[in-house]
UniProtKB/Swiss-Prot annotation:
The modification Phosphoserine is found at residues 42, 48, 70, 209, 274. GO terms for molecular function: ATP binding; calmodulin binding; inositol hexakisphosphate kinase activity; inositol-1,4,5-trisphosphate 3-kinase activity. Belongs to the inositol phosphokinase (IPK) family. This is Inositol-trisphosphate 3-kinase B.
């Protein structure tokens, strides 16, 4: 931008020199060449037909005497175009310029534009009396016929057409936290020493028209014209004030039509970065009186008085002009722009006051106006991570609930007075900081009403210096409830102290150019991870402060390491002294409906790989679903496997006790959608495939094919416990033998002594082993298998009870010696608690199974060995029986069938399945005919 300013400066000087040599009757002063292709000016413009260069003049009411102390006053006999005041060189007696600095008319600075105007001034010899009189008449005629709003519109169009295609240079400096987003041009004439000022209340009023008048008091005008750049040599370098919202003055009158033309005619805002080092180093440090009201960090605040007209609004383009300010950080540049808005739109202050500066950048949200000029309304401070704000929050209409508090001397009109209502969100939202997702800046604007007395400044930042961020680790105060003190003084009451985690260099803000995109600010607090950002607010919520008390807590999900407990074998089921867990036990289908079914699919270990491990509720931990900082210490698969002690999901062992009862604890995994996975067995898969097409299908678990998981194949079938709540389960092994004839033949061919089987035999019956077996302290497998059938009811009744699990979780497998009919009846009575409805339901179900078996083609041509009947009922008196475990069920040779109810002899392959089923039906029928349960 500086190079561009130099080029324009050279062109203007050359053009003015040519006109001087040719004797052109133009006034000596600042001129801006009109580029070719520029739109023609309106008939009321100031360009006379004889002129070759364009020149605009400020309104007549803005012409006034300069302060006595200012250099180059209009009484010095020279004309000067004041680049930072409202005079603009419009006096009839001013003849020449007294400075060679580059500037722009003050009224041009109020134009909404995204570029800079460079106006060169030259020292020329005083013209003759006749020429001066002629120029005076021309000026008077032009000032009478030209409307200021037309000048503004056309002049803005020229500036935008001149600079719309120019890309600002990027600063090569490194190590600064800067904006990653494009932003409009900034004012390069602002010195780095200038104290930042808070934003004007009307900066964010987007819904009001520009057409409203804002006549300024003479005091305000004199303040804005009071200073010229005190460093002409630096002004010469092409550092011109920003045209647009950053200009310190504003036009006195402006029509709605002009505002519409200006808004529609403005091109897209060009991108810009930080200025070049040359431009940074050449900034000047004028006094704070340039801006009618500005915030003095260590001394005072020049508060605003009333303006004589309605408060002007802003369109959306005005909110775009946030950019880095030289060596400043983005938030500092942001504040400096707001200081310019404040100086432009507020009146003079009768008396300065002090304000509190307590928070680092991002800790305090910018205060908002509640409808009045020179009034501020504090809001409850947002946390740093609350940087994401819905774009809707920036498009607000005026709130009819605003009220004006008495005692505000700066209030003029019913809605223009300074009402200060803490905690009420006004019509203007934080457009630059909230809308682009950046955190709020570390300033609290104080009340701007005339108030005797002062507030203590708490940061000690001296006047004339930039507002530096607090160093890392410095204790700051989290302001919660701003209190409106008497006389509209704003005091902030600290609530708690926190440690600011890092310097501003490590946490740059995110800026955009009026895109409405929600971006998360990078300001983070170490103690605020659990609080979500206040992003979307309903219209009723927009006038409420966003405080942690209004933030709903995120429900925690209790998860536990499934891998550490899933294998905990169902040994806990068999006689564990622990009582039932205080958790609702659900089946996997119920669990799948809660969204945790995927955890079953990712089980890392088999459920019986370590049967000695127990379920320890103390190992449960609380895992919060943190959206701010996702945990990366554990893999997602591990997390899904840890759902164990959730109130929605019960233990896998509790849901599948029949797995342990049937002796297959190491073969199962849980699956989703009410299914379980059993280790693949070729013979069982073949049987299940055939059963799905057989009449027995209603009495067997539904088979859903085989799947590969963790490198292993599994048969996937229905979870039979899905429809039961706290079920009672019994496993009965059917048949008069539980081993295949092939197993017996193989064991005889290669007999091997098994000490483990001898130990089991001795535990059941110490007198069972023979003298030879006692001497060897070992038995063969065939011997053990045959002995095993004789000690239970298998050999006598055709079935035996493997185990019972009650609804309270207690497990009993001590049925090895349950041999007689009376013992079996007592076991069923204990299992059903004598409930006649359950006994009748079991009996009827067994009868239906028997009728189906008698006509089943599958049953006739298969030797069913090691299969079980699974009895399930619950407290709702639901009772079902299923046929399970077909791993040892083998097909017979072609044309051979079995009767299933004749005694077994080695070689006939009879299994005695129907014999055992008939005995079960008889026992249950006898029990169901007994006296009903009282």
């Amino acid at each position: 931008m500086a190079v561009y300013c130099y080029a324009l400066n050279s062109l203007v000087i050359m053009n003015s020199t040519n006109e001087l040599k040719s004797g052109s009757p133009l006034p000596s002063g600042s001129e801006t060449p009109q580029p070719s292709g520029r739109a023609a000016l309106s008939p009321g413009s100031v360009f006379s037909p004889g002129r070759g260069a364009s020149f605009l003049f400020p309104p007549a009411e803005s012409l006034s005497l300069e302060e006595p102390g200012s250099a180059g006053g209009w009484r010095s006999g020279r004309r000067r175009l004041n680049s930072s005041s409202g005079s603009g060189g419009g006096s009839s007696s001013s003849n020449s310029s007294s400075s060679s600095g580059v500037g722009s008319p003050s009224w041009a600075g109020r134009l909404r534009g995204d570029a800079q105007q460079v106006v060169a001034t030259r020292i020329l010899s005083p013209p003759g009396p006749e020429e001066a009189q002629r120029k005076l008449r021309i000026l008077q005629r032009e000032l009478q016929n030209v409307q200021v709003n037309q000048k503004v519109g056309m002049f803005e169009a020229q500036i935008q057409a001149q600079t719309s295609a120019i890309q600002a240079p990027r600063s090569p400096r490194l190590g600064r936290a800067r904006s990653p987003s494009p932003c409009p041009f900034r004012s390069s004439s602002q010195p780095p020493e200038r104290v930042l000022a808070p934003c004007s209340p009307s900066e964010e009023r987007r819904t009001k028209s520009w057409g409203e008048q804002c006549t300024e008091t003479p005091d305000a005008n004199s303040r804005r014209r009071s200073r010229l750049s005190t460093h002409p040599s630096k002004d010469k370098e092409g550092v011109a004030p920003l045209l647009g919202p950053a200009s310190p003055t504003r036009l006195g009158t402006q029509s709605p039509s002009t505002s519409v033309r200006m808004e529609r005619g403005s091109p897209a805002s060009p991108r810009c970065g930080s200025p070049t080092p040359m431009e940074i180093d050449k900034r000047t440090a004028p006094s704070l009186e340039h801006f009618g009201t500005s915030l003095t960090l260590a001394t005072k605040v020049a508060a605003s008085a009333a303006s004589a007209g309605p408060h002007p609004g802003h369109d959306s383009v005005l909110m775009e002009a946030d950019c880095e300010l030289g060596a400043m950080r983005p938030w500092e540049a942001h504040l400096e722009r707001r200081g310019q808005f404040l100086g432009r739109e507020t009146g003079s202050a009768p008396e300065p006051i002090r304000t509190h500066i307590r928070e680092p950048p991002g800790r305090v949200e910018r205060v908002h106006s509640v409808g009045g000029q020179g009034s501020w309304t504090p809001e409850v401070i947002k946390r740093p991570e609350e940087g994401t704000v819905d774009a809707q929050s920036s498009e607000l209409s005026e709130n009819p609930r605003w009220s004006r508090l008495p005692g505000d001397p700066g209030s003029v009109g019913p809605e223009k007075g300074g009402s200060r209502i803490p905690g009420i969100r006004g019509p203007q939202q934080t457009l630059d900081s909230m809308r682009e997702g950046s955190s709020a800046l570390g300033l609290l604007g104080g009340s701007q009403a005339a108030q005797p007395g002062s507030m203590d400044v708490e940061t000690g930042i001296s006047c004339g210096r930039m507002l530096e961020p607090l160093p890392p680790g410095e204790v700051t105060t989290n302001l919660k409830e701003p209190q409106c003190l008497p006389g509209d003084r704003m005091g902030m009451q600290p609530e708690s102290s926190i440690v600011w985690p890092s310097a501003v260099e490590e946490a740059p803000l995110i800026w955009t150019c009026d895109t409405g995109i929600q971006l998360k600010g990078t300001w983070r607090s170490q103690d605020g991870d659990a609080h979500p950002s206040c992003q979307e607010k309903s219209p009723d919520q927009k006038d409420k402060a966003c405080s942690p008390s209004n933030i709903p807590a995120i429900p925690a999900v209790i998860i536990t390491d499934m891998g550490a407990q899933e294998d905990g074998g169902l040994e806990e089921i068999q006689g564990s002294p622990r009582g039932p867990l205080p958790l609702r036990k659900l089946s996997s289908s119920s669990a799948s409906s809660t969204g945790f079914s995927s955890s079953y699919e990712d089980s890392e270990e088999d459920i019986s790989s370590d049967p000695e491990r127990t379920l320890d509720p103390n190992s449960a931990f609380l895992h919060t679903l943190d959206q701010q900082k996702p945990r990366v210490s554990k893999s997602w698969r591990k997390i899904k496997n840890m759902v164990q002690w959730s109130p929605f999901v019960m233990s896998f062992k509790k849901k599948y006790p029949w797995i342990q009862l049937a002796g297959h604890a190491g073969s199962f995994k849980a699956a989703a959608n009410g299914r379980i996975l059993k280790k693949h067995c070729e013979s069982e898969q073949r049987c299940l495939d055939r059963l799905m097409a057989d009449v027995l299908r209603p009495f067997v678990p539904a088979y859903h094919g085989d799947v590969v998981k963790d490198g292993e194949r599994y048969n996937q079938m229905d979870d039979l416990l899905a429809d039961f709540d706290s079920p009672c389960v019994m496993d009965c092994k059917m048949g008069i033998r539980t081993y295949l004839e092939e197993e017996l033949t193989k064991a005889r061919k290669k007999p091997s002594l098994r000490k483990d089987m001898y130990q089991k035999m001795v535990e059941v019956d110490p007198e069972a082993p023979t003298e030879e077996e006692k001497a060897q302290r070992a038995v063969t497998k065939p011997r053990y298998m045959q002995w095993r059938e004789t000690i239970s009811s298998t050999a006598t009744l055709g079935f035996r009870i493997e185990g019972i699990k009650k609804e309270d979780g207690s497990v009993n497998r001590d049925f090895k010696k349950t041999k007689t009919r009376e013992q079996v009846t007592e076991a069923f009575r204990e299992f059903t608690k004598g409930n006649q409805n359950i006994l009748i339901a079991y009996r009827d179900r067994l009868k239906a199974i028997r009728e189906t078996l008698e006509v089943s083609p599958f049953f006739k041509c298969h030797e069913v060995i090691g299969s079980s009947l699974l009895f399930i009922h619950d407290k709702k008196e639901q009772a079902k029986v299923w046929m399970i475990d077909f791993g040892k069920t083998t097909p017979l040779p072609e044309g051979q069938t079995l009767q299933h109810d004749v005694p077994w002899q080695e070689g006939n392959r009879e299994d005695g399945y129907l014999s055992g089923l008939n005995n079960l039906i008889d026992i249950l029928t006898e029990m169901s005919q007994g006296s009903p349960l009282t």
